């Protein structure tokens, strides 16, 4: 059949199309608009999936040859290496892992290289997971939901990752509403969910995507995996962040007494389990408000701990 866009006719060979997800892990069937434009790009890897659409569902098909966005691996800082050690110490053989993007994921992936029979069920598949599969740390043999394959909603990383994923039967992709469903996540035992944050306040609220209304990333599946991991038998959820960041040459604490007005919470305090910085790892579940505050202050950079204690008293969080 053929489709036309702007007078250009594009021919295809099959009536049924096997589709990758879009940038948010969504499939064609989730869109209800009148116009559904499919893009064919030879640089996109073929990703194994059972989610297909009939050609009649598409308004038109466009061919293009755009290079994919490549995100380089960053060398983890000593702080991130310390964080990865704390997380690895809490990880058992056979754990089913979920990680995000960036240097935290690289560090955690390196820290898991002494673990065996790991599984993967993650919103995003990245380079650190690819390395664990290549090394044999990931076998997916202990997964009970989608066993035998590393499952995800989308890929993001380097060119090496895209080339490795192309026609790779070790991988399986599914729409994000299914991949990120906490009840599906919990079908695997010993889920290890590792997500990052920009800031966390003294009661355990997490901000991971925005500061004072400025959006730095999408919300993604953080809350889904935080909940799904804790519903999993033996599962653990980690919010990991370095204790500080530097802006314009000045050091700031990532553990704050309160968020600035206009900052929106990504994960509520009632859902947060483990919090990790380079100074330690604490489990906030079942802690009183005072215990939470003291536990989180212990994770802060030493230069800010006294100030945080004073602010906690000022706000009525400590006597």
Regions found by a protein language model. Give the residues of each.
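Conserved alpha/beta enzyme-core scaffold
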Residues: 1-319
């Amino acid at each position: 059949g053929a489709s036309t866009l702007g007078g250009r006719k594009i021919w295809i060979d099959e009536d049924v199309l096997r589709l990758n997800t879009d940038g948010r892990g969504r499939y064609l069937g989730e869109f209800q608009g009148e116009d559904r434009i499919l893009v064919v790009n030879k640089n996109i890897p073929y990703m194994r999936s059972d989610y297909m659409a009939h050609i009649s569902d598409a308004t038109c098909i466009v061919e293009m040859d755009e290079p994919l966005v490549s995100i380089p691996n960053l060398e983890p800082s000593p702080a991130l290496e310390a964080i990865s050690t704390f997380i690895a110490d809490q990880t058992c053989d056979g754990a089913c892992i979920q990680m995000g993007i960036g240097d935290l994921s690289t560090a955690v992936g390196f820290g898991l290289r002494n673990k065996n029979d790991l599984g993967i069920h993650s919103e995003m598949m990245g380079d650190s997971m690819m390395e664990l599969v290549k090394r044999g740390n990931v076998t997916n043999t202990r997964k009970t939901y989608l066993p035998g394959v590393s499952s995800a909603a989308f890929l993001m990383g380097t060119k090496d990752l895209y080339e490795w994923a192309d026609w790779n039967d070790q991988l399986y992709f599914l729409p994000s509403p299914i991949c990120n469903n906490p009840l599906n996540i919990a079908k695997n035992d010993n889920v290890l969910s590792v997500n990052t944050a920009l800031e966390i306040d003294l009661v355990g609220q997490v901000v991971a995507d925005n500061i004072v209304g400025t959006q730095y990333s999408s919300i993604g599946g953080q809350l889904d995996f935080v909940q799904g991991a804790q519903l999993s038998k033996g599962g653990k959820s980690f919010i990991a962040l370095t204790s500080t960041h530097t802006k314009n040459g000045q050091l700031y604490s990532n553990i704050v007494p309160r968020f600035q007005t206009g900052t929106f919470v990504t994960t509520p305090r009632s859902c947060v389990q483990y919090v990790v910085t380079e100074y330690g790892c604490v489990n906030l579940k079942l802690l009183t408000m005072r215990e939470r505050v003291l536990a989180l202050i212990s994770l802060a950079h030493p230069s800010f701990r006294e100030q945080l204690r004073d602010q906690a008293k000022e706000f009525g969080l400590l006597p």
